[in-house]
Amino acid sequence: TTKTETASKMARRLSRIFTYAVVLRLRTDDPADWKLLSHVLPQKNKIAPIKHREAMEYTDCPALFAQLQENDAASSRALQWIMLSACRSAEGRQMTWDEIDLEKNVWVIAAERTKQRREVRLPITPAMQEIIRWAEPMRRSNYVLTLTDKPLSDVAVSKQLKRYTSRDITVHGLRSSFRTWCQESGVEETLAEMCLTHLVGGNTRNSYARSDMLEQRMGIMTEWANFLKNTNK
C-alpha cells in the first residue's frame, strides 16, 4: 500500500494486540513489531513522500492568540491551551480534571492518551492557569475544555482555527510553530523536543535520563506564553 500513515496506525494497533497476547502466553512474539518488519519492508518515506502539516509562521502566533482571547467559546479556550502547552490536539481536547495538579502546576497525561504510549508531565504556566480558572465554574464533566459532558471534537477546534487563519493551517501545525520559535529563541534542541514530548534518542538523551527537566521546561513554556501574549520584556 502507498497509504503509509494508515498502515502505520494499523501496525501499532496490531502490535498492542499481539503484545497483550504474549502477556497472556497465547503467543511467543509480536509479528507486527517494526524492529522485525523493518528488515523486509521499506521505510515509509521510500514509498510515498511525507506530507508535513501546514504550520503558521511563529511570528503570526501572537496575533492569532489575541483573537482567540476575544472569543469565549470552549473551542477557543481549547486552542489557547493547545498553543500554550504545545500539546497534541487530542491530548488537550480530552484533558480531564484528574490529570491536573495545580499545587505542583503539573499536567500528567496517562500513557494510554499519548502517542508514544508513555506517561508524560507538562508544566502548567500562569497563562494556562487562567484557562483552568475559566473552566472551573462551568464544569459539567471530568473533561476540562468543554461545556458539555463530552470532549470537544477535532472538527470543532479545527473550525475555530480556520476562522482566523488560512484553510491550510492545521491545529497540529501549531506545534511546528512552537518548535520554530524554540529554534529562533536559542532553546537547546533536546529541551525543545522534550517540550513537545518527543522521544529523544542517542547519547544526548542519556544525559537527561534521570529527569524530565520539568523545571527547565516550565521556564521555556512561560517565555513562550509571554511571547504569545506580547508580554516579553
Residue ranges and their predicted role:
Residues 66-69, 73, 97, 133-137, ...:
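Hydrophobic alpha-helix feature that most strongly marks membrane-spanning transmembrane helices
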Residues 5-12, 122, 215-218:
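A generic "alpha-helical surface" signal
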Residues 18-26, 89, 99, 186, ...:
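A generic secondary-structure signal for well-formed alpha-helical elements
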Residues 2-15, 23-95, 103, 115, ...:
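Basic, Lys/Arg- and aromatic-enriched nucleic-acid-binding interface segment
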Residues 3, 10, 17, 55-62, ...:
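Active-site/catalytic core of tyrosine-dependent DNA strand-transfer enzymes
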Residues 34-43, 85, 94-134, 200-206:
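Conserved tyrosine-mediated DNA breakage-rejoining catalytic core shared by Y-recombinases
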Residues 47, 109-117, 129, 150-151, ...:
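Catalytic-site neighborhood detector that most strongly recognizes the C-terminal catalytic loop/helix
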